[in-house]
Amino acid sequence: MATMVLPREEKLSQDEIVLGTKAVIQGLETLRGEHRALLAPLASHEAGEAEPGSQERCLLLRRSLEAIELGLGEAQVILALSSHLGAVESEKQKLRAQVRRLVQENQWLREELAGTQQKLQRSEQAVAQLEEEKQHLLFMSQIRKLDEMLPQEEKGDVPKDSLDDLFPNEDEQSPAPSPGGGDVAAQHGGYEIPARLRTLHNLVIQYASQGRYEVAVPLCKQALEDLEKTSGHDHPDVATMLNILALVYRDQNKYKDAAHLLNDALAIREKTLGKDHPAVAATLNNLAVLYGKRGKYKEAEPLCKRALEIREKVLGKFHPDVAKQLSNLALLCQNQGKAEEVEYYYRRALEIYATRLGPDDPNVAKTKNNLASCYLKQGKYQDAETLYKEILTRAHEKEFGSVNGENKPIWMHAEEREESKDKRRDRRPMEYGSWYKACKVDSPTVNTTLRTLGALYRPEGKLEAAHTLEDCASRSRKQGLDPASQTKVVELLKDGSGRGHRRGSRDVAGPQSESDLEESGPAAEWSGDGSGSLRRSGSFGKLRDALRRSSEMLVRKLQGGGPQEPNSRMKRASSLNFLNKSVEEPVQPGGRVFLTAAL
């Protein structure tokens, strides 16, 4: 059986196929012309007398011509298909080039997006920082508005540092030392502040209260140098002296120097007394207050929380000092916009004050006022109004007795005047009557409460009630000495417990006393008229004279009763000799006085 051998198939390119097809078309067209030429005579003979076999030839030619036409048509189709494939390939190349460009553009867009995201992140951080600064500026603006409410002569005489009110020193918040404070200190490490350091602290306060920092600072530095020579740097007395010097620096607005000293004191006390000692908590609180004055609320908050933990552990969760620390922590959170935490801390502080100190303690009204301010910022106006009314009612009961039909607090009179204003058709003002005596309640907290409650009445349309409260607040301001100043004068001149005073540019100039000197003994005693109050003058000149006389009395007491005017250029050694006489200790060889730590 024979086997067919097929020719080997070769792959032709598209161009070769096109060229071959064109050659075939030319051959078919030539062949078609020849067939037509042969077919024409045969067709004419077919119409006449046909020759034998002409019909068969004519039929074959026509069939061949049809096949040729079919071949030409297919060849044209192949050429058209080739042209279409070429166009498709060209379009494909264009699309590929476009894809490459899109890939490059996509990569560029990704890089642009990454850069934009980084810019957005930096912008969000900047916005958060600006928002925090905005909140701080808003709070400072509110403080300034409160300052503008003061009488003009007060603003001229006593420039007010709002941060001193925002972060009051611990000794200012508590009118008396915590009961059993010395026992607590003895139980936790056995360290008690020596009487000589307490006396030195009081003397430094007297000098600084007169703005005589050129005497107070060298006095502190000399005492610190002597303590380091006798006891070494890592001694609790050195830490106490560092605290005193830091508070003097803080009053001079030298915050960086004060922070450095407080951190050094903190390290010493943690090393010598332990991390859970009350003195460590006091130093932490002072450091937090310092950061708060500089606007570093985030850095201050963990320090304040740690001080709170120590005091809760040492004193218990219901001690007044714990409430004091809670109030400081609430102030820090308030400046960071943490409204819920502020409310929680103030509620705890209020519960402690009311339980341990009684409802008539000034700290109760002050904490209620702060809590009401927190409610205002949260939009809880009804809760804030309730607290303000409680403050006014309690102040009225404390001053004038229980509330009854005729003895009503000022806010009740204000609302009665609001209700009866439409009945007074002649529009004559009401007689002051019994509510006028409520203006005699001269407390700074009550005065602030009157103004704030009046501001709450105005959006409610209670203009008459608002005017009544504001009028009462103004009358309270005009009576004698300003309430805030009167309170500080009484604490300074009558308390005799070594409390700290405000900075030199305020009502009572000088550094705030160190928080950890809560167990300190009596300081300078005031032997004035015994009333504990001063009459108001056109300026604070009399107050400064009183402070100067108090300083002279302290120096005479330290000298043993001899009259001597403290000199602004007094040498450090002389000041230390006063201290030496006050505690009746012998002078060390060489005539130099050394402050020793008595445990």
Swiss-Prot record:
GO terms for cellular component: ciliary rootlet; cytoplasm; cytosol; kinesin complex; lysosomal membrane; microtubule; neuron projection. It is a peripheral membrane protein. Residues 532-541 have a biased composition (Low complexity). It is found in: Cytoplasm, Cytoskeleton; Lysosome membrane. Residues 154-188, 492-541 are annotated as: Disordered. Keywords: Coiled coil, Cytoplasm, Cytoskeleton, Lysosome, Membrane, Microtubule, Motor protein, Phosphoprotein, Repeat, TPR repeat. It comes from the Eukaryota. Residues 78-143 form a coiled coil. One of its GO terms (biological process) is microtubule-based movement. Residues 154-163 have a biased composition (Basic and acidic residues). The modification Phosphoserine is found at S174, S178, S443, S505, S515, S574, S575, S582. TPR repeats lie at residues 197-230, 239-272, 281-314, 323-356, 365-398, 447-480. GO terms for molecular function: kinesin binding. Disruption phenotype: Mutants show a progressive hearing loss with an increase in auditory brainstem response (ABR) thresholds with age, mostly affecting low frequencies, with a sensorineural (not conductive) pathology. At one month old, there is extensive loss of outer hair cell (OHC) hair bundles. SMART domains: TPR. Its main location: cytoplasm. Belongs to the kinesin light chain family. Kinesin is a microtubule-associated force-producing protein that plays a role in organelle transport. The light chain functions in coupling of cargo to the heavy chain or in the modulation of its ATPase activity. Through binding with PLEKHM2 and ARL8B, recruits kinesin-1 to lysosomes and hence direct lysosomes movement toward microtubule plus ends. Oligomeric complex composed of two heavy chains and two light chains. Interacts (via TPR repeats) with PLEKHM2. This is Kinesin light chain 2. It comes from Mus musculus (Mouse).
